[in-house]
């Protein structure tokens, strides 16, 4: 029996001819990632294990993005600990205030991760890089510590689910609608410890940003990882960024999948995940009138330049609704700068939105937009659990940037076509 894309990457890095689901393997890593929340725990474990060196200073990335710029003394202390570790071990890819971005937007942008890589990160949304045809997954801080020291990690080879993408998305429907549609279909445990493998003729109609968004939320379906077939769009993106050679892994024609889903992109409508689970999805006709207090456009899911562009298009010459707050967060400094160059920031500010420096901030209820009791927020982030963005009685509605921007203008949950 043949292997899937994920299985081929794992077999290669484990030095094996083949692997099967449920095999336990040790595999060599191409990148180990941590942030300002998870890295301090990894550093403590690193020291407790009495490790004396890192395996490769060029294959570790530390990104201060969650509570940065530091929101309080504890956050500052954690960042200082990471800063000292990066200096002591001469870590090449250390990003702090000034060059920092939201990690899962920053690493692909900078070419630090690329096609065919095996990546672990002490952050659950590390699965984002599967958009590039990499095997990428989140781990705990202890595994991060061992990875930094040895360059290896253990894996249980996952079973696979295949998603055949067909057709083309409608105007103002994007990758966020696709992944919310899928999660609504299979549930938050529908891909539990599985690899979600995306391909099909519809792939050519999805941008890299669409794919990054979709892969980012594979974890919200319980997946071990999400991974996309590599095509000309992927290769063009990678060649413009990475300085490393890369290898493309293609699934065998006789690869085995537990399930196969055909996803008709043409039929997907604006989709929103209602509180308090990403699987609690509703399409536009079923939304009803939901009055909102806040909109957040940004995060590792939807803080990329294309997201800023569509938000600016919708907000151009419009005004944020009275009694509605709109917070926009470009995910990296380069995206922020390009927003300035293209006039997006002027559009946002004239509309009545506030623009933040890159940060994860409100997504995890950290800072830059915490919700009070009973407040409702439309957000382009990836989780809407109870209390995720603030008070336990607040509500988070997960949406695309298109829906978020339209909702900010009307003050109620809306789609772009609802704006006169």
From Swiss-Prot:
UniProt cross-references to Pfam families, sorted A to Z: Aconitase (PF00330)
EC annotation from Swiss-Prot or TrEMBL: 4.2.1.33
Molecular function terms, GO-annotated: 3-isopropylmalate dehydratase activity; 4 iron, 4 sulfur cluster binding; metal ion binding
CDD domains in alphabetical order: IPMI
Entry superkingdom: Bacteria
Catalytic activities: (2R,3S)-3-isopropylmalate = (2S)-2-isopropylmalate
Cofactor requirement: [4Fe-4S] cluster
Entry's cofactor comment: Binds 1 [4Fe-4S] cluster per subunit.
UniProt keyword annotations, A-Z: 4Fe-4S, Amino-acid biosynthesis, Branched-chain amino acid biosynthesis, Iron, Iron-sulfur, Leucine biosynthesis, Lyase, Metal-binding
Residues reported to bind [4Fe-4S] cluster: 300, 360, 363
Involved pathway(s): Amino-acid biosynthesis; L-leucine biosynthesis; L-leucine from 3-methyl-2-oxobutanoate: step 2/4
EC top class named in words: lyase
Biological process annotations from GO: L-leucine biosynthetic process
Keyword set includes DNA damage: no
Matches recorded under HAMAP family: LeuC_type2
Family in the record: Belongs to the aconitase/IPM isomerase family. LeuC type 2 subfamily.
Family matches, as NCBIfam families: hacA_fam (TIGR01343), IPMI_arch (TIGR02086), LEU2 (TIGR02083), PRK00402.1 (NF001614)
Functional summary from the UniProt entry: Catalyzes the isomerization between 2-isopropylmalate and 3-isopropylmalate, via the formation of 2-isopropylmaleate.
Oligomeric form and interacting partners: Heterodimer of LeuC and LeuD.
Protein name, UniProt field: 3-isopropylmalate dehydratase large subunit
Organism: Helicobacter hepaticus (strain ATCC 51449 / 3B1)
Gene: leuC
């Amino acid at each position: 029996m043949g292997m899937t894309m994920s299985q081929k990457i794992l077999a290669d890095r484990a030095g094996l001819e083949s692997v099967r689901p449920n095999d336990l393997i040790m595999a060599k890593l191409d990148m180990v990632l941590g942030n300002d929340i998870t890295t301090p725990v990894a550093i403590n474990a690193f020291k407790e294990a009495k490790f004396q060196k890192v395996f490769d200073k060029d294959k570790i990335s530390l990104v201060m993005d969650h509570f940065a710029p530091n929101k309080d003394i504890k956050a500052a202390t954690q960042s200082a600990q990471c800063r000292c570790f990066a200096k002591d071990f001469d870590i090449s890819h250390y990003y702090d205030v000034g060059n920092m971005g939201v990690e899962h937007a920053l690493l692909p942008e900078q070419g630090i991760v690329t096609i065919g890589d095996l990546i672990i990160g002490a952050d659950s949304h590390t699965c984002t890089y599967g958009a590039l045809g990499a095997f990428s997954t989140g781990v705990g801080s202890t595994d991060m510590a061992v990875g930094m020291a040895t360059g290896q990690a253990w894996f249980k080879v996952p079973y696979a689910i295949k998603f055949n993408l067909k057709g083309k998305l409608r105007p103002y429907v994007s990758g966020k609608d696709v992944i919310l549609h899928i999660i609504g279909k299979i549930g938050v445990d529908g891909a539990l410890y599985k690899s979600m493998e995306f391909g099909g003729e519809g792939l050519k109609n999805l941008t890299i940003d669409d794919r990054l968004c979709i892969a980012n939320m594979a974890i919200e379906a319980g997946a071990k990882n999400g991974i996309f077939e590599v095509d000309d769009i992927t290769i063009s993106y990678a060649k413009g960024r990475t300085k490393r050679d890369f290898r493309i892994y293609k699934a065998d024609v006789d690869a085995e999948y537990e399930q196969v889903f055909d996803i008709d992109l043409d039929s997907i409508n604006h989709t929103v995940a209602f509180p308090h689970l990403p699987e609690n999805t509703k399409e536009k006709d079923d939304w009803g009138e939901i009055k909102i207090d806040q909109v957040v456009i940004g995060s590792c899911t939807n803080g990329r330049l294309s997201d800023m562009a569509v938000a600016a298009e919708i907000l151009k010459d419009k005004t944020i609704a009275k009694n509605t707050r709109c917070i926009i967060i470009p995910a990296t400094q380069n995206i922020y700068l390009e927003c300035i160059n293209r006039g997006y920031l002027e559009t946002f500010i004239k509309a009545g939105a506030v623009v933040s420096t890159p940060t994860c901030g409100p997504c995890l209820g950290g800072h830059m937009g915490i919700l009070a009791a009973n407040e409702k927020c439309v957000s382009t982030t990836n989780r809407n659990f109870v209390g995720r963005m603030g008070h336990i009685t607040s509500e988070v509605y997960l949406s695309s940037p298109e829906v978020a921007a339209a909702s900010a203008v009307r003050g109620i949950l809306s789609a772009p076509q609802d704006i006169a």
